Amino acid sequence: MTNVDVDHLDHFATFDNIVESFEQYVKKIDGPKVMCADDAVTAKIAAKQACRTYGRSINADVRAVNVVLADGRSRFDVEARQSGSSSLQVLVGSVDLPLRGEHNVLNATAALTMAMELGVEFVVAAQALSSFRGVARRFDMRGVDDGVTFVDDYAHLPNEIIAVLRGARDATDAWSRVVAVFQPNRFNRMSVMSSAYADAFGDADVVVVTDIYSSGTTPIPGVTGKLVVDAIERNHPGKRVEWIAQREELVSFLASTLTSGDLCISMGCGDVAQLPDEVISLRQSSRTNEARKR
């Protein structure tokens, strides 16, 4: 279990109910249980049960240390203590992961921890991770057009957005700007959670918010993507934040605003996944039309 966040309050009503649901779920698991020691909630759940913990925390049973984030990769060492022991941790080995971001270091450490719990040798698991290229819609490189790099990610909750944007800037990145395009999801979620996004875009130079992707939920009067914009502007009055509700206007804005050296990251769990292709297509057709006029 990586972390527990506020979500689906329309179903659970309170965060305490969410935590209780996870606690009951973990209790029913007969096999190995691996929990993140860096997350306060999962650490609390782990303390009540027989679990193996992982993370960057000194309290973790399996730790990622000496982390280097550069060249779009993550390199780190792994220390571990024997199961059931409180003794000092010992160096197990090193990992060279072809994925960027602290969150992927933690995910890889979780996978290593579970693999070792199941009897897989560390060197075998680490070798497998060294060739893991990630999955679709997780910092998914969608193309480079005239110097602009387009990335798409499924991130749609505040902590996910923070992790993605933080991961977009490693020691060797030289983007001119990071332009974050966020498509909020679910009217009922945004009606109670819009303010939670206020500090999620700190690592973006420009933030563009679209209208809400319904995911089958019913529109609520007054609940639009503008709520997210207002939340960001209240906490960060100097940040450039745009609210562009209509898709055609959004594509046109990005096609004309993005310049060479920019990184454009589209985020959300709706049809924003198609946005990079739409923007690239318009930019290319615009250049073709300009060339014909000469």
What function would you assign to each model-found segment?
Residues 249-282:
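A glycine-rich beta-strand to alpha-helix segment
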Residues 5-7, 39-40, 156, 184-187, ...:
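Short glycine-rich anion-binding loops that position phosphate/pyrophosphate groups of nucleotides
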